[in-house]
Amino acid sequence: MTATKQHKKVILVGDGAVGSSYAFALVTQNIAQELGIIDIFKEKTQGDAEDLSHALAFTSPKKIYAADYSDCHDADLVVLTAGAPQKPGETRLDLVEKNLRINKEVVTQIVASGFKGIFLVAANPVDVLTYSTWKFSGFPKERVIGSGTSLDSARFRQALAAKIGVDARSVHAYIMGEHGDSEFAVWSHANVAGVGLYDWLQANRDIDEQGLVDLFISVRDAAYSIINKKGATFYGIAVALARITKAILDDENAVLPLSVFQEGQYEGVEDCYIGQPAIVGAYGIVRPVNIPLNDAELQKMQASANQLKAIIDEAFAKEEFASAAKN
């Protein structure tokens, strides 16, 4: 996609709870001029396209339709939400093999269409499926992006903001690592309007050390809490995807926490996608933003990456996945 292109086209693959919520976010936030939706349940997809189109008189003109894979050929962005949902009691990593098969089938058909844009992956386990999208597509690593820890970081900022009594937009803090159980908070660089978090807390006494531990656990386990109550999470990730989409289509060079390919940014972390901040624009990842981690944080990053690598290596040792790899 050229940064000056006026007509911006998004194809969404997967019209489940996350996908349809994302489509709704694009419509209400006036993002993109064309939205095609692909799903195996074609009648439901046609219904969603019609329903979303009825909101356009309140927003802005947009072409919305039930698409097929041939429509990907001139898209700027393809967003992948298709996959088996996470069930109560199931971790994101439990989903690996069944969603890898779906991912392989979907990515192969998208590439066959002649697609030359950017992949944005949200299906879980997102770090593993972003890696597999890169492998199956043969695309440059900069043009394959995962939603990563974007939602986790938003949850973290919101939880901190609620505890200390400020707007979440004034809290600057990141969750890094796997989007899942091995993620970690980068406490060493968290700040409120430029004031280091620990300095802020020392001056204001809003929360003690155990309170911070409990806050992080609530952030890390938020998805499990929501899944147990309503069966799935979709609104938060949908808005996170819309934010990433806007940054790409508008060539914002925004810094967002995403699944980013690792090639030595952090010692001992290579050949995997994992959550870290990165600059993102019209051509995908411009460059990662390598927050200097303290020793404890680096160890957590390495442990998280090692867990992901073990799963990736096991999966791609199987002929059905290894034979489809192009990278």
UniProtKB/Swiss-Prot annotation:
Write the record's keywords in alphabetical order, separated by commas. Allosteric enzyme, Cytoplasm, NAD, Oxidoreductase, Phosphoprotein
Listed binding positions for substrate are: Q86, R92, N124, P125, V126, D127, D152, S153, A154, R155, T233
The UniProt GO MF terms for this protein read:
L-lactate dehydrogenase activity
InterPro entries xrefs: L-lactate/malate_DH, L-lactate_DH, L-lactate_DH_AS, Lactate/malate_DH_C, Lactate/malate_DH_N, Lactate_DH/Glyco_Ohase_4_C, NAD(P)-bd_dom_sf
**Enzyme Commission number(s) of this protein:** 1.1.1.27
Just give the chief location class. cytoplasm
Q: Which GO terms describe its biological process?
A: glycolytic process; lactate metabolic process
Any Pfam family: Ldh_1_N
* Organism per entry: Streptococcus pyogenes serotype M1
Upper classification of the organism: Bacteria, Bacillati, Bacillota, Bacilli, Lactobacillales
Superkingdom is Bacteria
* Gene name, Swiss-Prot/TrEMBL: ldh
This protein's pathway reads: Fermentation; pyruvate fermentation to lactate; (S)-lactate from pyruvate: step 1/1
Which cysteines pair up through disulfides? They are none
Detail which positions bind NAD(+): V18, D39, K44, Y69, G83, A84, A122, A123, N124, S147
Q: Tell me the compartments it is located in.
A: Cytoplasm
Q: If you read the UniProt record, what top EC class would you report for this enzyme, in one word?
A: oxidoreductase
Q: Which reaction does it catalyse?
A: (S)-lactate + NAD(+) = pyruvate + NADH + H(+)
UniProt protein name: L-lactate dehydrogenase
